[in-house]
Every structure is written in structure tokens, then in C-alpha cells.
Amino acid sequence: MFINNFDPVAFSLFSLEFRWYSLSYIFGILAGWVLAKRIFIKDDNLKEKFDDYITYIILGIIIGGRLGYVIFYNLDYYLENIFEIFKIWNGGMSFHGGLLGVIVMSVWFAKKHNHNSYVYLDIVSSVAPIGIFFGRIANFINSELYGKETTLPWGIKFEKIDEIYRHPSQLYEAFFEGLLLFFILIYFRKASSAKNPGFLSGIFLIFYSVFRFFIEFLRMPDEQLGYVLFKLSMGQILCLVFFIFGSYLTLKKYDHQK
């Protein structure tokens, strides 16, 4: 059994506080950008375009992530407190919302440059698990998105929450949705179907959705929502939607290769 009493503030500079959660976004985006350019992108022209594309990705993550949280997780509150939507520093981001934002911005960027949007989405899918890893570690440090009660020897007591030992669900997600998924995608990049733009994006959606869907059974539901349908959380319902889309996309691209 372990105790979590981490300070969510990484360091302070003058009067500014730099929080682990904000730094996780910065580390994730920088690591993804470096990996994409050095390992996953072979075409020099695409490498040049990718520098501009990163700006679109950042906007997609921030705008989509925030709007996703507002719409999917706390709509009633934000309808009554409209200006709170813009206070991102108070927390409240949705991975699925950020994912939708990235998809929209990728399509926009690709059309602007007359490219196939799936080419960009496959690159992002290949490095996204690194960002997910950093994000879930930050969730753990912040004592948020914590798990249900457990008697297992690796249970964690989140001192900022209560005296109960809980599943470190953030660490489960960091491992499965982050590290393991990263290596799964590297494996599938070698498949012949990976030559078809969109195949890797589908693989990412499938495995991310499966991992998160089952881990959420060990995670406390969002306090303001609880369980939404048949003891399923909002995150699990969104995972089912993305799993269906990812399966369709993967099969479509696989059949095309055949």
C-alpha cells in the first residue's frame, strides 16, 4: 500500500506556478513532434509541413478537449456559467473531445494543402500514446480520475481525497493506453495494410477504446455525472462509439489492401 501526497505544482518562477498537468501537455506535444519528425515521417516535404501542422494539433487539443468536457461531462453547469468555459486553468479537459478536435483540424489542414488527412492522422496516432502517458501521470500527481477501493498490495491512498486505498487507475491507463499502445502501433506499422492511410488511425482507436473501456470499471465515475447508462460511464460510452468507428476504418483499409 502506498500514499499519494504529491504537490500538483511542479515549481514556481517569480509569482507564476507551473503545474504538472500543464507541463504534461507541453512534454507530450514536444515528444510527439520530435518522434514524428525523426522516426515516423520519411518524406522531407511532409516533415516541413508537419511544423505548421503542429499548430493545428495544439488548437484541436485545447479547443476540442475543453468543448468536449463542457458538452460531454458538465453541460448543465456551463450553460448556467458560460464564462467559466474559457477558464481552462481551472481544469476540465476531455480526451475524446481533444481527439475530435484533432480530427477536425487535421481534415482542415489537409484540405488546405491538398493532402490526404489520414496521412496526418496516422502520424498523430503513432505518437499520441506518449502524450497520453504524460497526461495520465499528471492525473495521478493531481489525485484526479482515481480508482475504486481496493485491498490489493499496490493500492494507493490519495490523501487529498480520503483515507481509502484505491486502484491507481491513472497508472493503469498510463501503461496500457500510453506505453503498451505505443509499441502496439509500432508493431502494426510493419503490416502491409499500414501503407493505406487511415489503417493506423483505426488501430489506435480500437486499442485505446478497449483499454480505457475496461480500466474504467476500476475507476470512479465523474462525480457530477455518475453512471450514464447500464452502469457505464460517459467515458465508456464514448469509447464504444470510437471503437465502432475504429473497427470500420481498420477493416475498410485492410480490405482495400487485399
What residue ranges belong to the model's regions?
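A feature for loop-to-transmembrane-helix boundaries and adjacent hydrophobic helices
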Residues: 1-258
